Amino acid sequence: MRIIMPVEFSRIVRDVERLIAVEKYSLQGVVDGDKLLVVGFSEGSVNAYLYDGGETVKLNREPINSVLDPHYGVGRVILVRDVSKGAEQHALFKVNTSRPGEEQRLEAVKPMRILSGVDTGEAVVFTGATEDRVALYALDGGGLRELARLPGFGFVSDIRGDLIAGLGFFGGGRVSLFTSNLSSGGLRVFDSGEGSFSSASISPGMKVTAGLETAREARLVTVDPRDGSVEDLELPSKDFSSYRPTAITWLGYLPDGRLAVVARREGRSAVFIDGERVEAPQGNHGRVVLWRGKLVTSHTSLSTPPRIVSLPSGEPLLEGGLPEDLRRSIAGSRLVWVESFDGSRVPTYVLESGRAPTPGPTVVLVHGGPFAEDSDSWDTFAASLAAAGFHVVMPNYRGSTGYGEEWRLKIIGDPCGGELEDVSAAARWARESGLASELYIMGYSYGGYMTLCALTMKPGLFKAGVAGASVVDWEEMYELSDAAFRNFIEQLTGGSREIMRSRSPINHVDRIKEPLALIHPQNDSRTPLKPLLRLMGELLARGKTFEAHIIPDAGHAINTMEDAVKILLPAVFFLATQRERR
């Protein structure tokens, strides 16, 4: 066994800190007439900024979690801030764009888990979860009103006049479209037998334009909120239909009435205006706005931290500088298709390290969600592993978004089942293809759960594993969750207590043979700490090799550089230490 020398440890610390510190920006809209509203991970935390083409102006006093989506040109910004040391009990704060830093707490909104929201400048409409309900709320001159109870996770997409449109995970894993009325409240839910709705926006004609993701493709439809009738949307240009997307990640109407759409295929997106494709940098893009006569969006790739660019030139407006030595540590990336146990092909992104030999040490990095996607987008975890000399394999296991509804829904009723086989297939591919000399596994949230599943159900496949903010016991987690997460667990497990019990790693501790690092935020309210403490006791009682890091006063969401370092650094250092054990 070779011991990591202090100089190597120092390099890992320095590189991880530098990667976390790189400024990252996402575009939220246009406010104060003609200023861009940007949320940035900068100055060591998440903050809201105004950008007028020159300098940025910070709006908030203290770090935030997010902002509510603003209508074009409004003179204020609604900030979302955790006021519970990471437990995701959020409060709302208003700041006028003309008086940066002068925050006013909206006292009518008691702390709750804020899921989404839109600010019209006169009314704030948002969804929130408490222990006993998920609801749609409005805050305006009449005070705070509950417009409707929601069956599960719900997200406000748009408001036009009194019409509110949104999306929700209301049953069976599918995504429904819903509408409500700002004045009178109420809830109408629209489902499609073909698949799930994705991003939605209200047209000038007061119909809801939405993405409809079916078994293996995605298309645009309009939904009449009066009768629920659904029609395919015809666009002036055929570029969009020729692109044949599998996902629609964002859409919205520009002030001039044109429809902007961001669609994705094989982990990369394309931008369309009224169906015509707009030249954009390769990678992925966020919302699109019209600003001073030009299109602006956010852009990222596996080698490019999130930044703000104009289209079609791709000229950066706001970006963080990635140090050249760290840029070189990312030797390249590609998408491969891995055959799984049932003949399914698992779309898998591969990030090769410029600091590792081939074959070399390789980490299977498993994304959370599970309804999420690894794509050609910046990932600080993956970049840190590459800088530490690991190749990275990122499988989009069944349950992942971006590859059609058929693939996404395969996970329902089968957690720690088929998707674990997909992750295992990606690991075997890494070795058989000549990329990996030895294999490790790492994940956060549902990815941490996959680490525990792999070490309990697939002993011997990986040399060691890192489980961050992981699910340990579905039954106990259910009892500790609020209304939104209880509904999520019911949908994922099919409501089966037997599935919850049999697919919980706490019940299979005896099978763990490889070293394990546990990293968990103290105040995590999505994957609570209590089950992990029981797991630690079981590991200790059985003489298993493990280390544990509890991050004080932190929650599931990583919103400060300090929390990011406390989570990522022990993970990378643990894997680097295990790599030297022969």
UniProtKB/Swiss-Prot annotation:
Location relative to the cell: Cytoplasm
Keywords: Cytoplasm, Hydrolase
GO cellular component, one term: cytoplasm
Keyword Mitochondrion: no
Principal place of residence: cytoplasm
Keyword Kinase: no
Gene Ontology molecular function terms on file: omega peptidase activity; serine-type endopeptidase activity
InterPro entries: AB_hydrolase_fold, APH-like_N, Peptidase_S9_cat
Pfam family for this entry, one: APH-like_N
Transmembrane spans: none
Enzyme Commission number: 3.4.19.1
Reaction it catalyzes: Cleavage of an N-acetyl or N-formyl amino acid from the N-terminus of a polypeptide
Active site (record annotation): 445 (charge relay system), 524 (charge relay system), 556 (charge relay system)
Listed Gene3D superfamilies: alpha/beta hydrolase, Peptidase/esterase 'gauge' domain
One of the protein's GO biological processes: proteolysis
Disulphide linkage map: none
Sequence similarity: Belongs to the peptidase S9C family.
Function: This enzyme catalyzes the hydrolysis of the N-terminal peptide bond of an N-acetylated peptide to generate an N-acetylated amino acid and a peptide with a free N-terminus.
Protein name as catalogued: Acylamino-acid-releasing enzyme
